[in-house]
Curated annotation (Swiss-Prot):
Keywords for this protein: Methyltransferase, S-adenosyl-L-methionine, Transferase, tRNA processing
Protein name: tRNA (guanine-N(7)-)-methyltransferase
Organism for this UniProt entry: Streptomyces avermitilis (strain ATCC 31267 / DSM 46492 / JCM 5070 / NBRC 14893 / NCIMB 12804 / NRRL 8165 / MA-4680)
The encoding gene: trmB
Gene Ontology CC terms: tRNA methyltransferase complex
Binding-site positions, substrate: K183, D215, T252, R253, F254, E255
Amino acid sequence: MSDSLHTPEEPRPGPGEQLAHAHDGSLRHTRAKGEPRFPDGPKADPAGSHFERRIRSFQPRRSRVTAGQADALQRLWPKWGLDIDGHALDLTELFGNTHPVVLEIGFGMGEATARMAAEDPDTGILAVDVHTPGQGNLLNLADQHGLTNIRVANGDAIILLREMLPPDSLDGLRVYFPDPWPKKRHHKRRLIQPEFLTLAATRLRPGALVHCATDWEPYAEQMLDVLTAHPDFENTQPTGGYAPRPGFRPLTRFEGQGLDKGHVVNDLLFRRVQPRDQHRDLPPSATEAD
């Protein structure tokens, strides 16, 4: 994929605002009071997950949305987007084929996701995030480059895994540059925890790959420890350490900036092993609050 998968500069409306022409012919941003940000787009907290007493690994934030992103959310969400609302999901129906599907949790502005989709059109990517500009940008990139193997999911990935995806339905899990929650008191918010891996394992087919990447060394060490200790996964590296960056994971602009500053990026590549007990119970609602 060429370097054309970048976000163009556009007028920047406020969160959920629409562009309108002012009397002087310039653009201004308006939204009626009480009007949803995107009537045909992603909903705020679609499954009501914030009423659950559970620690979360993400922090929703309101961000400015460009005109192009807003247009993509309105126009393409009914086609390629879905809200994580707790209802069972049929991946064959969602993608319109029986191709393998990988789950990507957290995709930023979506440029790396779009590149991977372009390089592997026979694999579906179910990309989850709560960042509205990124959702709109990824939809825009998919539309511009004819990438029909991307679906954008809005909401809590735990609910998606726990309530919406059937067992053994995923051929891979990708978690690239998750929030490291660097403060010690926030470490419990990190996504890669034993409870999360136990839940994810029930949705991953034997042989499916779990691929994580981070430039935060302490988090990389925790990921390596947790994945190594988990009985449902094995390290693909004979030495038992970090993996070289696989060719299918593109170098992102964010990652490039970090490398220029001397940051070290660690990739972890683990394989889902054949479960010893096919009837092992699902975990409770992953990472319960105290």
